[in-house]
């Protein structure tokens, strides 16, 4: 099988919360009739011990290993999910859901508010990473899984993994945190604010009610994506890929995209608006900004993981990731160790920046495969 051949999901669709089980949010709000869109790959074994939950990043979705229904592009982590890969449907029952607040089928600001018959827009309640995880836990239960073999995620997905370990440690055997942090830094909040302001400054945003006017703030969302995408890269990677190469034979002596890197960013922005909702971008980036695992534990990160001492952790960082640098990952590992948890850690040398966890990184693949193989032996799966 080719490295990026799609695999067929074993199941999936949309799960609707029972009418008597609304999702209660950290903000004090409630979402009635919440829907969660998800995909599964593989089969649950007889003792239901092989389930793996994959948590996606900011602009990801549930289509982790199958073609995206809008763009037709391969699943965002098809490199690692598939036959003979670290996460193998022949061995694992793999679950991936679109986070609440998202725009790929789970309830979010673009969904219809049953109370009004119109899209939620900004009437959608502000959500947190913990709210996302609470919804995932209910979905996992609905799928017949009590304890997950592993919870795996990178970037915002890694935040969800940590939240699982804090809130539901008894429901997970192992945890893999890639290119993440235990709280959002001031720099990261600042970049998110630039993106949000770009969206809200677009005249077509219409106070978040753009759907009612039949328009979309595409220009603002594209600029937000361009700014964010820079943080996912690294200077060495940009220099290697683009340098100061021109898009054409000579300078335009104007403000068109003279440089290849400019054209690349414009393409990233314009293609992003075809698959993502602007209000979802506001809500999910705000959830990331609010993320601070230690905040509700007296500011002491180790205390947050006290109940997770029986969970096996793997934490991987990348040397050129300046969005979630290695120092922040080491801080997490020290806290896990202080809490009495088993934590394996590695910094992977890479010049690809934050997005390295999504790209071809054989050392990461080997580390992940080795950790999961060890955990499978300890779990009695092999």
From Swiss-Prot:
Domain called AB hydrolase-1: residue spans: 50-360
Binding annotation for substrate: 225, 355
Protein's GO biological process: homoserine metabolic process; methionine biosynthetic process
Positions annotated as active site in the UniProt record: 155 (nucleophile), 321, 354
Stated family: Belongs to the AB hydrolase superfamily. MetX family.
PANTHER family, per the entry: HOMOSERINE O-ACETYLTRANSFERASE
Protein name: Homoserine O-acetyltransferase
Organism whose genome encodes this protein: Caulobacter vibrioides (strain NA1000 / CB15N)
Gene (name only): metXA
